[in-house]
């Protein structure tokens, strides 16, 4: 998993609350079990005017030229609600997003994002709206998210503090998924196993 320390990138806003995982990645695209290849189906029902995905919807933000290459997504309350499918953060990451900023997230989506190297940042509704307004006002507007300093810097230079559980921060800073985190304690595990009584082995 790629480590995350700080990221500056083009931002795009989806100004809707309660965006659920079926909107993020519809169920008909969940047959794969590997993490790659889901980006093309991200927000499928909004991005395309047809079921085959051949006719892009020109009104949807991700299809607009000014947001091409966006790596920071701004959203409203309760982002990632609905079913617990891990494919949702897979699709967002495969599309190129590194950070999702919203006032609140669904708990399971929040955890799945961290486990897959995608940073979910909680800011107040007022702060998120300011970011959305600034991004809409200036083409090419970029936001900086610093996980070491726990700050978000808006296009105009406003700085917002955010919090994240230290264990999650540690995993992201060091690029550790659940398996990688376990392996980081390999020596301690080995030491423990050499000292436990044989009948526990």
Swiss-Prot record:
Top EC group: lyase
Entry keywords, A to Z: Amino-acid biosynthesis, Branched-chain amino acid biosynthesis, Leucine biosynthesis, Lyase
Gene Ontology molecular function: 3-isopropylmalate dehydratase activity
Superkingdom of source: Bacteria
GO-annotated biological processes: L-leucine biosynthetic process
InterPro entries reported for this sequence: 3-IsopropMal_deHydase_ssu, Aconitase/3IPM_dehydase_swvl, AconitaseA/IPMdHydase_ssu_swvl, IPMI_Swivel, LeuD
Annotated EC: 4.2.1.33
Nuclease recorded as keyword: no
Catalytic activity: (2R,3S)-3-isopropylmalate = (2S)-2-isopropylmalate
GO cellular component terms, A-Z: 3-isopropylmalate dehydratase complex
Biological pathway: Amino-acid biosynthesis; L-leucine biosynthesis; L-leucine from 3-methyl-2-oxobutanoate: step 2/4
UniProt-listed Pfam families: Aconitase_C
Keyword Amino-acid biosynthesis: yes
Family: Belongs to the LeuD family. LeuD type 1 subfamily.
HAMAP family reported in the protein's UniProt record: LeuD_type1
Subunit: Heterodimer of LeuC and LeuD.
Functional note: Catalyzes the isomerization between 2-isopropylmalate and 3-isopropylmalate, via the formation of 2-isopropylmaleate.
Name the UniProt record assigns to this protein: 3-isopropylmalate dehydratase small subunit
Species whose genome carries this gene: Shewanella frigidimarina (strain NCIMB 400)
Lineage: Bacteria, Pseudomonadati, Pseudomonadota, Gammaproteobacteria, Alteromonadales
GN (gene name): leuD
